[in-house]
Amino acid sequence: MAGHSKWANIKHRKAAQDAQRGKIFTKLIRELVTAAKIGGGDVSANPRLRAAVDKALSNNMTRDTINRAIDRGVGGGDDTNMETKIYEGYGPGGTAVMVECLSDNANRTISQVRPSFTKCGGNLGTEGSVGYLFSKKGLILIAEADEDALTEAAIEAGADDIQPQDDGSFEIYTAWEDLGSVRDGIEAAGFKVQEAEVTMIPSTTVDLDIETAPKLLRLIDMLEDCDDVQNVYHNGEICDEVASQL
């Protein structure tokens, strides 16, 4: 989790947990159904749905399963009463944490989220307590490319910013509504998109030391273990030196 990379620091991913296909598939299907319900089943006109489809495909979900989930969202049914809820709180070291949930039972969800904060030395805040520290953005990851050519293509496609990373990759930021069109423009210019999603970008970050970094990672792990939690965002910054000791 390199300190220079927002992509690496914003969301902590656990490969071992993601390998539990049943659990991750359940969350992916929920997002597909909800995205289709809210914005319709046309991927080209629904950025949230397109991001959900891309994520499902990257996790080896079949097209048939994806299409069935979209059809359920468009057609209605027992599983389309899911609602998105954002919980905000404070994690170890004074970090700001936002927890995006998809649930049909708010009481059940809060009973999962609140203890996770408490057990890790944090506390669940009120609505708006840390949300002002984040901005909703589209984020595109390019593994490697010629910087000048990619910058030109990204600007032409409507990107807001492009940031080269120490490992040779590039992070491209867009207005979240423009994620799909910017991605299309970049791909049309011949570049391969490794990952693209709507995310929350912190305006400020908190440097974590060897004592606080493991506590934040434990909090993220506990939250991601909750069935109703879709995404966890934070503003913790873990530098390479600290990460190498974890």
Curated annotation (Swiss-Prot):
Transmembrane segments: none annotated. Keywords: Cytoplasm, DNA-binding, Transcription, Transcription regulation. GO terms for molecular function: DNA binding. The keyword Transcription regulation applies. It comes from the Bacteria. Belongs to the TACO1 family. This is Probable transcriptional regulatory protein HI_0315. It comes from Haemophilus influenzae (strain ATCC 51907 / DSM 11121 / KW20 / Rd). The lineage of its organism: Bacteria, Pseudomonadati, Pseudomonadota, Gammaproteobacteria, Pasteurellales.
